[in-house]
């Protein structure tokens, strides 16, 4: 099995374990039915069409089921998404100068000015308002994540 996804041996064996939880009959492939059973046991309630879409998304050979290499490729892709989460966290720290977990208008103005963006108070307030879901006048981490992911 080639490891083009740069996964560690440990990750591969964890994914193998997860795969066998899905692969109820142990035939080496996950059907939409098996996927549904696991999803429901995790408190999800996917429709038949959603399950089919999920399988189709990773079913590289088009045989209607997910085999282990396809499962591995899907997990590796998900792991890459985690990197972007780390990048968002780093970006948040840049703005959150005092490290109190929120970005104030002053912090936002400071960073934007350092980036060469001369903004008026109104423009800074507008940026805060756009990202400030709960209306408390500052941007917390979850609001920052939402803003970054909606770009």
Swiss-Prot record:
Gene3D superfamilies: EF-hand (1.10.238.10). It holds the Pfam family EF-hand_7. Ca(2+) 2 binds at residues 59, 61, 63, 65, 70. GO terms for molecular function: calcium ion binding. Residues 10-45, 46-81, 83-118, 119-151 form the EF-hand domain. Ca(2+) 1 binds at residues 23, 25, 27, 29, 34. Ca(2+) 4 binds at residues 132, 134, 136, 143. Keywords: Calcium, Metal-binding, Repeat. One of its GO terms (cellular component) is myosin II complex. Ca(2+) 3 binds at residues 96, 98, 100, 107. PROSITE patterns: EF_HAND_1, EF_HAND_2. The keyword Secreted does not apply. Disulfide bonds: none annotated. This protein has four functional calcium-binding sites. Calmodulin mediates the control of a large number of enzymes, ion channels and other proteins by Ca(2+). Among the enzymes to be stimulated by the calmodulin-Ca(2+) complex are a number of protein kinases and phosphatases. PANTHER family: CALMODULIN LIKE 3, MYOSIN LIGHT CHAIN 1, 3. Belongs to the calmodulin family. This is Calmodulin. It comes from Pneumocystis carinii.
């Amino acid at each position: 099995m080639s490891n083009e996804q740069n996964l560690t041996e440990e990750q591969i064996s964890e994914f193998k374990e997860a795969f066998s939880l899905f692969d109820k009959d142990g035939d080496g492939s996950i059907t939409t039915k098996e996927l549904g059973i696991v999803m429901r046991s995790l408190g999800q309630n996917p429709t038949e069409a959603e399950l089919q879409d999920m399988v189709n998304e990773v079913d590289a050979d088009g045989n209607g089921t997910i085999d282990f290499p396809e499962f591995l490729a899907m997990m590796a892709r998900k792991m890459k998404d985690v990197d972007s989460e780390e990048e968002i966290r780093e970006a948040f720290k840049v703005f959150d100068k005092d490290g109190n977990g929120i970005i104030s208008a002053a912090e936002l103005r400071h960073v934007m000015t350092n980036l060469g963006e001369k903004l008026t108070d109104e423009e800074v307030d507008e940026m805060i308002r756009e990202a400030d879901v709960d209306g408390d006048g500052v941007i917390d981490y979850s609001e920052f994540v939402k803003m970054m992911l909606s770009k």
